[in-house]
Design a protein with these regions (language model features):
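Short, small-residue-biased leader/transition segments that mark boundaries at the very start
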Residues: 1-7
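Alpha-helical transmembrane segments of multipass membrane proteins
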Residues: 18-19, 90
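Short loop-to-helix capping motifs
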Residues: 25-26, 99
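Carboxylate/His-rich catalytic cores and anion/metal-binding grooves
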Residues: 32-44
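Catalytic cores of carbohydrate-active enzymes
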Residues: 44-64, 72-238, 334
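Non-catalytic C-terminal accessory modules of carbohydrate-active enzymes
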Residues: 201-341
């Protein structure tokens, strides 16, 4: 994309953190910190009272209209949410490089943006953001923007607001026949917001079919790679990863492989927390790390869940079996773990 598409341009800020979380190497954050700061400062010059109003919005969102610019969700809502996200990443970076002044300054800026976002887009009487579309509600939920300021001006999470907005999100998905209406931008936030709140069964329902919008519909028409539009007959590219955001759910939730919550360790310590869903009986995946290949497969039959795990040398896996609260910590080697399902 050209400049001024915040949802794409913030890759300057996100990629160094993805690298850090994956490899435990913070060198890119330190190297590109000045660039991150300049980009945020640029966005600040384009904002009007904390609101950004340019970009593509939820590009290629789904509905009874020609795909393209955002139709279901206001462009300023999408742009401002990503503005907030960018600043929050910069705050993390400022802390890591030891810049106390920037930490305070950009924390204050982030709070101002969140206040402006909620003032502009939150309908408190209905607990809906923007138009109430799936992207409108999923973005602030994902970014934990459902907050209120206390008497001292400090922002804290509003659990009641979060629950009401999330309930509205679920209702909208169900009202559309367990189908999404999000686009290239909103897909990830919808899927991950549902996953973070334990709605894995709903995610499975949303994609385990052969209708549009869905991957099965593309397969019906012979697609061997993801197509740019949910209905490949509509033209556009037949080799476009744009709608591939479910891949994150496949690895992080369905198979359950994800890095430790202590990012500095990269995958020297990692989590395996599989989420069996629906009538799915078998899942298998592998993930290449600096330390070797993580192999995971599971079966779910006759009320028994069987997990096979291969842990690379000099690494540790923290395994959460379905329905069990206490994890099992295992060292390098090959294991089979069984539990009731």
């Amino acid at each position: 994309w050209s400049s001024d598409v915040c949802s794409s341009d913030l890759s300057l800020v996100i990629f160094p953190f993805m690298y850090y979380e994956t490899y435990g190497d913070d060198s890119l954050i330190k190297k590109y910190y000045p660039n991150m700061r300049r980009y945020v400062d640029y966005l600040k010059t384009r904002a009007d009272k904390g609101i950004l109003s340019f970009g593509l919005g939820d590009w290629y969102d789904y509905g009874d209209f020609r795909a393209g610019f955002s139709r279901n969700t206001p462009v300023p809502l999408v742009a401002t949410a990503h503005y907030y996200m960018t600043v929050m990443y910069l705050v993390k970076a400022a802390k890591m490089v030891g810049n106390d002044f920037d930490t305070r300054y950009y924390t204050s800026l982030a709070q101002d943006i969140m206040a402006a976002f909620n003032k502009c887009f939150l309908h408190k009487d209905t607990a809906q953001y923007g138009t109430g579309s799936q992207c409108s509600n999923a973005l602030p939920l994902f970014l934990q923007m459902t907050q209120n300021a206390d008497e001292q001006g400090n922002y804290q999470s509003d659990a009641d607001l979060h629950e009401k907005v999330f309930t509205n999100l679920i209702k909208d998905v169900e009202a559309h026949g367990n189908r999404l209406t999000t686009g290239d931008v909103g897909n990830r936030y919808l899927i991950q917001t549902l996953a973070r709140n334990g709605e894995h069964e709903l995610i499975y329902k949303m994609f385990n079919h052969e209708e549009a919008p869905g991957y099965g519909f593309q397969l019906k028409f012979g697609a061997t790679t993801l197509t740019e539009q949910w209905d490949p007959r509509q033209g556009s590219s037949w080799n476009h990863f744009m709608m591939g955001q479910i891949d994150e759910w496949f690895f992080n939730s369905l198979v359950g492989i994800r890095p430790s919550t202590t990012p500095k360790q990269g995958y020297q310590k990692f989590i395996i927390a599989p989420q069996p869903v629906g009538d799915l009986k078998y899942v298998k995946a592998s993930y290449e790390t600096l330390y070797g290949t993580i192999n995971v497969d599971w079966t779910c039959e006759n009320g028994t869940f069987t997990l096979n795990v291969s842990v690379p040398v000099n690494t540790t896996a923290v395994v959460y079996l379905p329905g069990e609260k206490e994890p099992k910590e295992i060292q390098s080697g090959t294991y089979q773990l069984v539990c009731a399902k």
